[in-house]
């Protein structure tokens, strides 16, 4: 059976030699959860936090073995803060959380302290998570734009970046697309479509 990663490479016309072996291992049959949600109602942090909580509950993901990957840290910082405040659950980040801004001045320090062994839901940019993997990966896709607010610039929306995110999963992938039109048709065709809103 052709893997999601190989299909992605074929559809977007590139080969990433660094991840080729990993792509061979990521057969669709090995995943217990390979789901896609298109959120076309705009980016709302409260709603996204609820959706992530629903995914964790419905799919039975262990938060200690789950990472939320985003294309940039702006959206991740807001969701992580909201998740932590609404659930009172521990989180681990590769960036400085909103309420720790004055304690640490450099995201590099957070990246160096990051480990998958720490207990809590992990939050990371795709770029910072290179070299790591997790049993459960929830990927947040953002709309392309000027890079301000929750939009991303084109350099963060390259197929190689999304491919890297896909290949971080050992077992389960859920993609929440928040208006990224470039990849919508591919994931809609190749993954199980699910709506976690109000569940």
Language model features with spans:
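Core RecA-like ATPase module of SF1/SF2 helicases and allied nucleic-acid translocases
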Residues: 2-4, 8-11, 18-21, 26, ...
């Amino acid at each position: 059976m052709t893997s999601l990663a190989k299909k992605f490479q074929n559809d977007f016309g590139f080969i990433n030699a660094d991840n080729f072996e990993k792509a061979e291992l990521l057969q669709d049959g090995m995943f217990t959860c390979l789901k896609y949600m298109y959120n076309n109602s705009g980016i709302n942090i409260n709603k996204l936090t609820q959706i992530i909580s629903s995914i964790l509950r419905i799919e039975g993901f262990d938060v200690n073995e789950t990472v939320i990957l985003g294309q940039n840290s702006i959206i991740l910082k807001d969701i992580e803060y909201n998740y932590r405040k609404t659930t009172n659950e521990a989180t681990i980040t590769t960036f400085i959380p909103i309420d720790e801004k004055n304690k640490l001045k450099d995201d590099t320090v957070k990246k160096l302290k990051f480990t998958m062994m720490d207990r809590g839901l992990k939050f990371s940019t795709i770029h910072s998570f290179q070299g790591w993997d997790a049993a459960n990966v929830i990927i947040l896709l953002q709309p392309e734009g000027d890079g301000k607010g929750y939009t991303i610039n084109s350099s963060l929306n390259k197929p190689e970046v999304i491919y890297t995110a896909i290949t971080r999963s050992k077992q389960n992938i859920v993609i929440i697309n928040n208006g990224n039109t470039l990849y919508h048709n591919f994931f809609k065709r190749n993954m199980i479509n699910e709506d976690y809103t109000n569940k």
